[in-house]
Amino acid sequence: MSDTSSPKPVASGEKFRTAQGITAIKDGQKRRASAEPQVFEPKPKWLRVKAPGGSRFEAVKRNVGEHRLSTVCQESHCPNMGECWSNGTATIMLMGSVCTRACRFCAVDTGNPNGWLDLEEPQNTAKSVELMALRYIVLTSVDRDDLEDGGASHYAACVRAIKENTPQVVVEALTPDFDGDHQAIERVVDSGLEVFAQNVETVKRLTHVVRDPRAGYEKTLKVLEHAKKHRPQVLTKTSLMLGLGETDEEILETMDDLRAIGVDILTLGQYLQPTRNHLKVQRWVSPEEFNRLRDIGLEKGFMEVAAGPLVRSSYRADRVFEKNNLGLAAPLPVPGQEVDASLIPALNLN
């Protein structure tokens, strides 16, 4: 008699083989040998979220599964998945669910896909966006250092497919750094998107602790700077996690570095440790402190600063652009990088 039981779930930190035959580490970090079990401190009350559920949540979940799509909502254990999916929105993760990098804050599986790509993904993604009746879609992806251009051509093909199928949909692309390759960056920026994002993740001092060695603080700044210089009308965006040991002064210095290269939008959120194998939370940042930092960021000239304990780079991204039902407000200009305001798309999302 054959065994019809469900396969045993893979434990965090263990090696496993994906459906595509890729060997990967579950949740991105190998299991740590520890003499004593790690004790997780209770989260503050402001970090409690409702369990996901509801008909709209199930519909989005079904749509994602039927079109073989990966979502950063699932792969990164995002605390906002229930809210976003229940509102009929999702952030789609391109180029599979296995990342070639292993950042110590991230719960995405890590391994070497050895060039694997789903060639039907551009059309499947475009069809899924249409079926979900989205007005604003955030695309992100794993890092693909195994591909010659870091996956830029495939990424751009996905954006073009969405625009060809549903030209009214606003596209935000949260991309890898493409190892700083200018041609790869331009390929994505020229694909028809409205917002180009690359996350700095943390302050300069902590970058080597938090991110994969192949990433870099200056590298991310140069990627964002080149994207803005190449196509000034495209909005640039980045995200910073708090609670990793950064100081207030370092946060403000990071804001200054970002404004110096013309970054338009900044998101600030609380770092949450996804598994015991990842970096520990150093402190809980209060909603009041996030509000204070948002005010400072706006004073420094960001078009918008989305800040809060549960804010993630793609959390309710469409709302960032709702400015009194009039579309986008122009950011303060950076000397030498002034942009004709008429070139900035007015995204009325009502």
From Swiss-Prot:
Give the matching InterPro entries. Aldolase_TIM, Elp3/MiaA/NifB-like_rSAM, Lipoyl_synth, rSAM
Q: Which residues form a coiled coil?
A: none
Q: Which SUPFAM superfamilies match?
A: Radical SAM enzymes
Q: What's a Gene Ontology MF term here?
A: lipoate synthase activity
Q: What class of enzyme is it?
A: transferase
User: Keyword Iron-sulfur: yes or no?
Assistant: yes
Keywords of the record, alphabetical order, are: 4Fe-4S, Cytoplasm, Iron, Iron-sulfur, Metal-binding, S-adenosyl-L-methionine, Transferase
User: Where [4Fe-4S] cluster 2 is bound, by residue?
Assistant: C99, C103, C106
- Identify the PROSITE patterns for this entry: RADICAL_SAM
Please list the reactions this protein catalyses: [[Fe-S] cluster scaffold protein carrying a second [4Fe-4S](2+) cluster] + N(6)-octanoyl-L-lysyl-[protein] + 2 oxidized [2Fe-2S]-[ferredoxin] + 2 S-adenosyl-L-methionine + 4 H(+) = [[Fe-S] cluster scaffold protein] + N(6)-[(R)-dihydrolipoyl]-L-lysyl-[protein] + 4 Fe(3+) + 2 hydrogen sulfide + 2 5'-deoxyadenosine + 2 L-methionine + 2 reduced [2Fe-2S]-[ferredoxin]
Residue intervals of the Radical SAM core domain:
85-303
Instruction: Cite the binding residues for [4Fe-4S] cluster 1.
Output: C73, C78, C84, S314
Q: What is its EC number?
A: 2.8.1.8
Please give the CDD domains that the UniProt record associates with this protein: Radical_SAM
According to its UniProt record, in which pathway does this protein act?
A: Protein modification; protein lipoylation via endogenous pathway; protein N(6)-(lipoyl)lysine from octanoyl-[acyl-carrier-protein]: step 2/2
Q: Name one GO cellular component term.
A: cytoplasm
**What is its subcellular localisation?**
Cytoplasm
| Necessary cofactors | [4Fe-4S] cluster
Task: Give the residue ranges for region: Disordered.
Answer: 1-39
Recorded superkingdom: Bacteria
Q: How is the cofactor bound?
A: Binds 2 [4Fe-4S] clusters per subunit. One cluster is coordinated with 3 cysteines and an exchangeable S-adenosyl-L-methionine.
Q: In this record, what's one Pfam family?
A: Radical_SAM
Q: Does the keyword Transferase apply?
A: yes
Q: Which family does it belong to?
A: Belongs to the radical SAM superfamily. Lipoyl synthase family.
Q: Which NCBIfam families match?
A: lipA (TIGR00510), PRK05481.1 (NF004019), PRK12928.1 (NF009544)
- Would you tell me the protein name for this molecule? Lipoyl synthase
Query: What is the native source organism of this protein?
Result: Ectopseudomonas mendocina (strain ymp) (Pseudomonas mendocina)
